[in-house]
Amino acid sequence: MSFFNRFGILISVYLCPDKWYNEGVMRRSIKPFVVYLFFLLVIGGLIFLDHQHHRQADVQVEKAEKTTQTSETDKEKVVEDRLATMTLEEKVGQLFWARVPADHQIEDLKSYHLSGYILFGRDFEGQTLEDMKVLTSRYQAASKTPLLIGSDEEGGTVTRISSILETPFQSPMTLYHQGGMEAVLSDARKKAEVLKSVGINAGLFPVADLAGDSSAFIYDRTIGQDAQITASYVKQVVEELQKNKVGSTLKHFPGYGDNGDSHTDIIRDNRSLDDLRQADFLPFQAGIDAGADSILVSHNILTKIDTVPSSISPKINEILRKELNFKGVIMTDDLDMAGLADFVSQDEAALQVILAGNDLILGSSYQTQIPYLLKKVSSGDLTEERIDESVRRILAWKYDLGLFDRSQ
């Protein structure tokens, strides 16, 4: 019996029940039909629920896209409004992320309009976590524009805050050997919480370098694994830092490899661009795809790419921007390091850093470098438009870290 025949019987039963009871059809026909109808209703219900699920998912995606678009619009407005009110001197000051000076810390923040301070070992000596929170709050209160407060916190041999912790932060390599990636990520979460609790909003990690030689300068600071595992490590650490709104910095682009120490020497790296693409670029690309905030460029000279240190090389900057499609903040390694300081003067280095396309200058010579850059703007060697490009990226990073929340 077809569906339509059975449906007709059901209607007839409803309209003339006595007739059908008398004829005994109810007993023969209705029971199987009710079962048949029940299954149709179940299937129909499942189809309806599936449709509703997909509809709700589409609505959620649409809401998320609108929220993202609204957030980006809000960020752009905050950045552009702040940029429009800044003097040239304030803009140039934003290009400098400085070591905390031995004296006049508050005065220099106000006089030079610095983008922020980087804390080193001496800044933690004799302090408690509460002391550091008070100190960073004083720095923030003294600055018209919210500050980047950073500290090298890779773990192991490179950690500043560990000197005042009961349990120092270990290196990623040690953690990976002890407990795999979960141990590394657990450490990253804890580190982010501690840093944020004392007002440090950027930890200058993770190290994205590869080194095959265990005696290489950078080896102990890496996770000590191949390009694929290192890429996974970098990606996941960046994501952990994002959750806590602690800034991430991938270093040291374009990859240290097995080379010497640019703190003490000019380093020349003879690897080709193809060599770097096949291995060293992979962790950096993974970090970029995960949303890394910033990338630190080394002073190593990649002889097959350029004749100058990477930190002042337009070609290296172009690789980051165009090939790896990085949109965030590009900073230099410390300009006081011999790998650059023995190559070019401090003041000229600052100019070359910005002309190469970088955004943030790390170092301690800002008292002469800032006036030098202002002079170069006056002479036409450096344009305010070029400065604005970098300041926009720096302010956008500060917005993403939630630093403008306190000042609006």
Task: List where the protein language model places each region.
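N-terminal Sec-pathway targeting helices
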Residues: E23-F39
